[in-house]
From Swiss-Prot:
Pfam families: PSF1_C, Sld5. Signal peptide: none annotated. The keyword Hydrolase does not apply. The gene is psf1. This is DNA replication complex GINS protein psf1. Its main location: cytoplasm. Keywords: Cytoplasm, DNA replication, Nucleus. Belongs to the GINS1/PSF1 family. It is found in: Cytoplasm; Nucleus. PANTHER family: DNA REPLICATION COMPLEX GINS PROTEIN PSF1, PARTNER OF SLD5. It comes from Schizosaccharomyces pombe (strain 972 / ATCC 24843) (Fission yeast).
């Protein structure tokens, strides 16, 4: 066990760093997560065994200065458990951040991979978070809470239609968005469609 302490959790973090800027969410690494959890439990068992042996032999509370080798082993197992737990929390927190970003953007870029990429708990989280967000936005229906906080440099932009959308109503009238057409439109009228992948900004 000593030879591999922290290796699996280190792999989780390295993989997370490599994939954090992808347009899709990579599959949940259930096997690696389970390996890290088992390593934490094994470290706890080793620590408990050391303490039981020392206290049984000495018939008194454990004193690190009296048992330096055992104290060093306990410190090693404790440190590895803390490290593994921090890595697990960082891995899961990063994935939850991506799911929250997905909900707030209202985009569909990740939809194709969500069914196969999420764990059962992540699916539950996504469903409940989406419901909470919908209820929150419903209370402020006159505002677009998912819009960008950075004002556009130009009021009007050129876009190319990637997928047929049909007619959309704007303040200046109806716009027909057919695939492969290019239009000069107001940025605020189409920013949601750009985020959802229907349009591309030129």
């Amino acid at each position: 066990m000593e030879n591999g302490l922290g290796n699996r959790s280190n792999k989780l973090i390295r993989d997370s760093k490599r994939t954090q800027y992808l347009d899709y969410l990579p599959p949940y690494q259930a096997d690696t997560v389970n390996d890290v959890v088992n390593e934490i439990r094994a470290a706890d068992r080793e620590s408990l065994g050391i303490l039981q042996n020392v206290t049984h032999e000495a018939s008194q509370p454990f004193q690190p200065q009296d048992h330096p080798s055992e104290a060093a082993a306990l410190l090693m197992f404790h440190s590895s458990s803390i490290y593994n737990k921090r890595c697990l929390m960082a891995y899961h927190n990063l994935r939850l951040q991506r799911l929250r970003q997905y909900c707030w953007s209202g985009g569909k870029r990740m939809e194709s991979c969500l069914d196969t990429s999420l764990s059962t708990y992540e699916r539950d989280y996504l469903t409940r978070y989406s419901e909470l967000l919908a209820a929150y936005k419903g209370a402020w229906s006159e505002l677009d809470l998912t819009g960008s906080l950075v004002p556009p440099k130009n009021l009007f932009i050129d876009v190319r239609v990637l997928k047929d959308v049909g007619d959309i109503e704007t303040e200046y009238g109806t716009i027909n968005l057919t695939k492969n057409s290019q239009l000069h439109v107001r940025a605020t009228d189409v920013e949601r469609l750009i985020a959802q992948g229907f349009l591309a900004k030129l």
